Amino acid sequence: MNPIFHVTTVDRWSAAVAAGEYRQSTLDRTLEEEGFIHCSTAAQVPGTLQRFYQGIDDLVRLEIDPSLVGAEVRYEGDPEAFPHIYGPLPVAAVVAVEPVSA
């Protein structure tokens, strides 16, 4: 299965590592508020960074193995489908963490 990606801040990722799972959907909304965690394909990450993360420092891109998530992953949206994780993201499902900038 192809990896999916999520952009977050270093601080939020560090908190998730300490907790064992990640529960933030977007910069401003939690998993509980949104109902899922917003993700992107590799090709969608640059556009996501441009649209939502301009001027934000200390960003990281989480590379996620969907087979390790343990929650439903659905591709949704029109005209372009984005991957959504319908549950918390286990830290163990993140196979790489890379610094990125918008």
Describe each region flagged by the PLM.
Residues 1-102:
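Conserved, structured core segments of small domains
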